[in-house]
Curated annotation (Swiss-Prot):
It is found in: Plastid, Chloroplast. SUPFAM superfamilies: Ribosomal protein L20. Its main location: plastid. GO terms for biological process: ribosomal large subunit assembly; translation. GO terms for cellular component: chloroplast; ribonucleoprotein complex; ribosome. This is Large ribosomal subunit protein bL20c. It comes from Triticum aestivum (Wheat). CDD domains: Ribosomal_L20. Gene3D superfamilies: 6.10.160.10, Ribosomal protein L20 (1.10.1900.20).
Amino acid sequence: MTRVPRGYIARRRRTKMRSFASNFRGAHLRLNRMITQQVKRAFVSSHRDRGRQKRDFRRLWITRINAATRVYKVFDSYSKLIHNLYKKKLILNRKMLAQVAVSNPNNLYTISNKIKIIN
C-alpha cells in the first residue's frame, strides 16, 4: 500500500495554534501537544481575568475616592459621598471621581460643596 501524505487541514490547525504560542518559551513553543495545552490554558486565564480586571479597577477607584474624602474632609466616608451624589442626581462614575480625587483634590472639594445638603 502506498503512503498517503497528510492533508493541509491538520497542518493549518497546528500553525494557527503555533501563532498563538509565538511568545511562549521552551517546549511550550516547540511541541504541538504542549502548545495546544498551554494555549487553551492561556485562553481560560485571559477570559477569567477580563472579568476580574473590572472588579479590581472598581475596587481601586473606590479606595482612592474613600482615601481622598477622608484626607480632605470632604465627607466622613465614601458611602456618604456616593449617597449624596445619587440624591442630587449628579452623574459622575467612580472612575471619573477617582481621577479627580488623585489629580485635583480641589475639584473634589467643589463637587462636595455642590452636593452637601443644607439642613
